[in-house]
Amino acid sequence: MSTHAATATAVPQKTPLLQSRLGSFLAVVPLSIWVVNHLWDNLAAFYGSAAWQTSVTQYKHPYAQILTFIIVMLPLLFHTGWGVVRLFSFRPNNLAYPYYGNVKYLVQRVAAVGVLFFLGAHIWLAFLQPRLIYGGAEPFAAIAYEMRWHAPTIMVYTLGVLGTAYHLANGLQGFAMGWGLLASERSMRRFEPWSIVIFLVLLGMGWGALFALYKAGGTEEVMQERARIMQARGVQTDH
């Protein structure tokens, strides 16, 4: 039995074609584009606080934030709902068919669960909470400090970026298969190295941004600025 055939047995067959293609399309356009752009913007952390704040938290147009919600959050909600439905119908068969494609499919489902929790935490902690509670975007110093001195934060973000990079890179291959762009085993094998390259590039961008934040969090300037922020919020700090 081929790898493709064995993998197909693990994929739920009850999802309507239109719904399946729409779900995969919204995952790639615009979500994947936004993820790449978001990772790129966060690399501005290498250039300091002002560059990062401008790149990540400031919008050039007053309606840009609303457009971001429509273009990104709504497709994300749809893709999440679509993925949860597929997840409940997922029945792994890796013991019966321990092929490479089946292992990738299983890891994709596991990564999806991890990414779901990671995005929920990230959206709340880095976007919603500071705006709803403190009335503005989370300052660079606060985020960089957490990356440096709060081990659970850097651990969650390290694993979250890993899962996101894999889920997106492998998802692009699934998208190409679902839309008929990769119609043969040969074409899938030829695309496999590109999928790995995409994964490594995304992972490098994400972990690079985390490293820049981690490094900045150890500077005296960031620690002093973070102390001022916490003092303004009425929170006592250890540093």
Label every PLM stretch briefly:
Residues M1-H239:
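Membrane-embedded alpha-helical bundles that constitute the cytochrome b-like, heme-associated redox core
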